[in-house]
Amino acid sequence: MIAEFSIENFFSIKSVQKISFEPSADTFMSDEYSYEVKDGARLLKVGIIYGANASGKTNILNAIEFFKMLVLRMPKDRNEKTGVVPFMLDDTSRNEKTKMSMVFYINQSKYILSFELDAKHIYSETLIVYDSIRPTKLYNRSYDAATDSTTIDFGVNLKMTKKSQDVISGNTINNCSVLAAFGKSNVERTKLNDVYDYFAKQVKDVLAPGMLLSGYVKSRLDKDEAGDLKKFILNFLKASDFNIEDVVLHEEEELITPELEQLIQNAPIDKEAKAEMLRKGKITNTELTFKHKAGDKVYDLSEEYESNGTMRFLGMAVILNYLLKTNRFVPIDEVETSIHYELLAYFIKVFLANSNGTSQMLLTTHDINLLNEDFIRRDTIWFTDKDELGETKIVRLSSLGLHKNLSPYNAYKQGKLVKLPFLGSQYINLND
């Protein structure tokens, strides 16, 4: 589970900003909201970020996704850019390094992974583990500008042979993380496997607002041989007042014509998948059919006739099932997209009531109705705000000193928590 993530000099974030899943002293719904990662240490399962348009909410999620990419991606060569973008709205920051750090738990051990980099190089990278109260260095990497080379100091407690250390060092070019180089190296199993696998398998990419999730739903249903997922989806949709009796996945094979082959060749598809398609000489088209009950009869509707909201919420149901059955970290941008507020609240409530593992969600939203709900803990709420210089600042609701009897919703509406968007006159002179 992620305990804390800090960012400095990344897109609209200039000074150090931090998101934390460590709970406050509040005991309200502690069992539902938190999970004990080790004796005496609990972490929150949910974080919710509010903010005006262009205040930097999405940049926080993108920073976590970029952090994951640093851990896993092996550059093509030493000249490939890292992809990092610093704060560009002053002359100093755009020439300074970006810093990122994450505190997370794997199997009751606390890890701290930190990077310092610019567009061309990773200047430092450190991985520390706390198996007890004392920190243990697993490795520390540094860049020497004079020789244009990277040096890695591996910790004794990593218990890795010198030969394996040399293999990883040889694969760690200046724009590549040690963990990414490790992922491409044939070396013995160590704690690096646990860290690499955590990011590869448990930290998911950002779910963007434009994703209707149709393809994701189809792929999950196609693998649902026992029918457990389908049963969960139908129960969830019925409880959410959708008049849907069944969802059926239909498959139809289509021969690849010369015209279709040309489209496949130019499509942004994985090379191996593309080659397999062309080898078979046919492709499989899938479509969802929804069975709606109207009175005493049931009618079939194909997915093209379903609303964006229905398709989005169907996808959210599949994601919810995924979160409850596996241990994952899922960031969702503008979670309320195409979804009625009551459905959003229900989605969060079901997750909290049924989550018994280490799954976490970090959500961004514009829907301030959640601030008026009794079931929302204040330490799960964060606000982003941009100052007059274009810099994003992040603040936690529980740190603002709002009295427990005062409504966060009313305080937000009155501009007492963060600045609200300043709106001019609704009358416009069309002749100007």
Cite the ranges covered by each PLM segment.
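Pre-Walker A-like glycine/lysine-rich segment at the N-terminus of P-loop NTPase domains
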Residues: 2-66, 432
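Conserved P-loop NTP-binding catalytic core
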Residues: 34-48, 52, 61-113, 118-122
